[in-house]
Amino acid sequence: MADDTLSGIYNYRPVDQAIGTSGQPSVAQFAEVAAAGFTTVINLALHDDPRYSLPDEPGTVQSLGMDYVHIPVQFAAPMEADLLAFFTAMQAHEGEKIWVHCAANMRVSAFLGLYRVIRQGWDKERAFELMNGLWQPNERWSSFIATMLAKYGQG
């Protein structure tokens, strides 16, 4: 079963049939992601730290037949423009199997929660279950989330 294979990926969390999330996968794990039928990878991590990135992640992902979208989000300073780029990427690949990752699934879980509330109309408690099961946002992230929810009418 795909979930058994994918469960070895750091902080892997299946969201539903169309979305999987995790921390940074290895090259071999990206092959498992492709084999599980995912067609798009959205990366919210940076490429400047070898502990949390692959040397040629775009090439690796594309060589496996998946689309690759990179939205580098500074963990210490998430930006509204990053969130809006994420919304655009999610909507552009709607109906596909999407794998979203960052270094530890923290950025992803926060952005996905915001996406679910702001763009899909979910209630906040349900939308942020993934995030709350992984981590408790620090002051910077809590403020960012609250600001985005307030700005887009869900605060």
Where are the regions that the model predicts?
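Short cysteine clusters
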Residues: 102
